[in-house]
Design a protein with these regions (language model features):
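Acidic, metal/ion-coordinating pockets
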Residues: 1-266
Length: 266
């Protein structure tokens, strides 16, 4: 029975995260016989946000699709890149007038995969459209045009990610993989939902374990102690790639196996 192996990579944090991806992603693809890599890159640029340089480096290192989140708008010079490259997604529940696209159907080894990027509203940006409504509309519009979907739910609240995943899976919308991003903390709840979607609440990050969500400890501690603005500095040491590996069976396009990735250089 033929299957597809898909790797989903947690938020790539700054230059250290991108450099780690550049050194290791192609080897990981070969080692695990990966057919497709989707990575969240919304914090991959130097400083914050995402830019053409970091996105291009992630693609050159072996990623097929880059998802983002609420930081996608931090660099105006990136807007034209979004408009010209549909393999980089911004959240689909931003207004249609925004640059870029929130989903794309991509051919991977002869199979049509719908990649969709959704933004949570709890503790995030309540003015955006409900991701539940957005998901319904897109899945309905593209019904019959894809074999299965991979969804990035970029959200703060675990309850919102959990509920949206079960909503999508429960309606049998042909979702093969649903994962959460944003918190930079990998959860240990990877499992297969009732109708066959592989799910994890958060992939984690590609960033330093000896940090606060990828930022130098002393910087964040200072902010908590003083309540004053600080300049975020990305920690460069002890980088780990976190995410999941999923196996999708091509006879029914359901997830047959999901496991966490925690890769560090020796």
């Amino acid at each position: 029975m033929k299957s597809l192996n898909i790797m989903c990579v947690g938020d790539i944090v700054g230059v250290p995260g991108v450099e780690f991806i550049k050194r290791n992603l192609w080897n990981l693809r070969k080692e695990h016989n990966i057919d497709c890599v989707v990575a969240n890159g919304e914090n991959s640029a130097k400083g914050n946000g995402i830019d053409a340089k970091s996105a291009s480096a992630i693609f050159d290192s072996g990623a097929d699709v880059i998802t983002t989140g609420n930081h996608v708008w931090h660099r105006k010079e990136f807007y034209s890149f979004l408009d010209g490259n549909r393999f980089v997604l911004r959240p689909a529940n931003y207004p249609d007038a925004c640059p870029g696209a929130g989903y794309n159907i991509i051919d991977i080894t002869g199979y049509k995969i719908l990649f969709i990027n959704l933004l949570g509203t709890v503790y995030m940006e309540p003015g955006t459209e409900s991701p539940f409504v957005t998901a319904d509309r897109i899945f309905s519009r593209e019904k019959g045009n894809f074999d299965f979907a991979v969804a990035d739910i970029h959200a703060e609240a675990t309850s919102e990610k959990n509920a949206l995943a079960k909503y999508i899976d429960g309606k049998e919308l042909k979702a093969g993989i649903i994962f959460g991003t944003h918190t930079h903390v990998q959860t240990s709840d990877e499992h297969i939902l009732k109708n066959g979607a592989g799910y994890i609440t958060d992939l984690g990050m590609t960033g330093s374990l000896d940090s606060v969500l990828g930022i130098k400890n002393e910087v964040i501690i200072q902010k908590f102690l003083t309540k004053m603005p600080v300049k975020f500095e990305v920690e460069e040491n002890d980088i780990e790639l976190q995410g999941i590996l999923c196996r999708i069976e091509t006879d029914n396009f359901k997830c047959a196996e999901i496991k966490r990735i925690n890769f560090r250089e020796i």
